[in-house]
Amino acid sequence: MIKTMIKRCTVLVLCMVITFGLFGCNLSVNNGKRIVRIAIAQSETHPEYLGLVAFKEYVEERLGDKYEVQIFPNELLGSIQKTIELTQTGAIDFAVAGTANLETFADVYEVFSMPYLFDSVESYKAVMQDTDYMEKIYESTDSSGFRVLTWYNAGTRNFYGKKAIN
């Protein structure tokens, strides 16, 4: 039963991380390279940060003559909410944030905070991988000056209590 409950709460995983992009961001250039700035709240040992390092390596190996990727971990540039605001102003290009932070910009993200929204990991992935459906949700922040680009599963959440939850 607990396993089923955890699976049903998988959507809360999405609350962990979603990557945003900004429309018309400030184009910072260093030595002829376009600088791409990414803010993340996690430490340098966290899997999300390590994923960004892999992204940086991928981009710079293939496009290193055109792009330099800078990653700012540990809320170095401010809280998650502040980094979202930095994408809005163009000070940075991307912020890694959860859907709870997006709720203030688009009500549609409140649905992802609902427990038991999905009855299985498979149903969760089926919805999240439906690009036409998710694109409509991602577009909901356009009027706020940024676009959600994607999602990824960062694990499951747990419920704790004195009595069994059935």
Provide a role label for each language-model segment.
Residues 1-35:
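Short, low-complexity disordered leader/linker segments with a strong preference
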Residues 26-40, 60-68, 142, 164-166:
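Immediate post-signal peptide segment of exported/extracytoplasmic ligand-binding proteins
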Residues 37-54, 74-78:
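Extracytoplasmic "Venus flytrap"
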Residues 47-54, 58, 82, 86, ...:
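Extracytoplasmic/secreted proteins, especially bacterial periplasmic and envelope-associated proteins
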Residues 56-60, 98-166:
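Contiguous mixed-secondary-structure segments that line small-molecule binding/active-site clefts
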Residues 64-67, 83-97:
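Alpha-to-beta junction loops
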Residues 69-71, 148:
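Generic structural signal for residues in well-ordered beta-strands
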Residues 72-85, 154:
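Short helix-initiation/N-cap motifs at beta->coil->alpha
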